[in-house]
């Protein structure tokens, strides 16, 4: 009986050790963060009349709900709320932020457009001929693109139509250093007088991606027609390297869409500092 008890205890300890080992592996990422999302898809008509134009707002807000470090969780939520909805909502709970933002968007839409729509109705006999630009929309969708040890890459996709020929859309990235509890900037990654050398690397990579050999050839395609090609703070880190993300109009016309330029770490070794996050990504 005693022998059976000892054997059973050994099995229990062995299984427990295996489970704790699994948990350690699962929680190897700083903060052991767990995420949820708040989703909204709401349509509201002018004058609350379904026969009239409407606005549509879509939100999918990803945020941390649990962490082994509450200060880290709260800090991330502050950055994410600010980036998605603006500084005025900092300090509010995520659920309340999304609720208030949705209500404010609808309220401002009606306040701004109802007087103009009323005037248009007076001037035009056929209500259906009133411009479609009264139908507004806004989308804010975010997600965690990468969560690896001390790094969390957070992407925000934004699109909006407020009348005119077309809407506008853009993506914004936050590369969160989870030990410092703040976003990484280029100065945290590169050392010395890196900007000119990094600019050359971006031009060279763009030429390689587009199979041309000169700056002029790129310019003929539309690159650098709306802004200078230079390192942007809108970038994201990955195991492949650093990707610089240029939204529409940053360096190209709307018709060309956004531009991504990925520079492998090996091409930038002479410019990189000793940030531990880079070492983890390169391993």
Give the residues covered by each predicted segment:
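Bacterial Sec-dependent N-terminal signal peptides
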Residues: 1-34
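Compositionally biased intrinsically disordered regions enriched in Thr/Gly
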Residues: 22-283
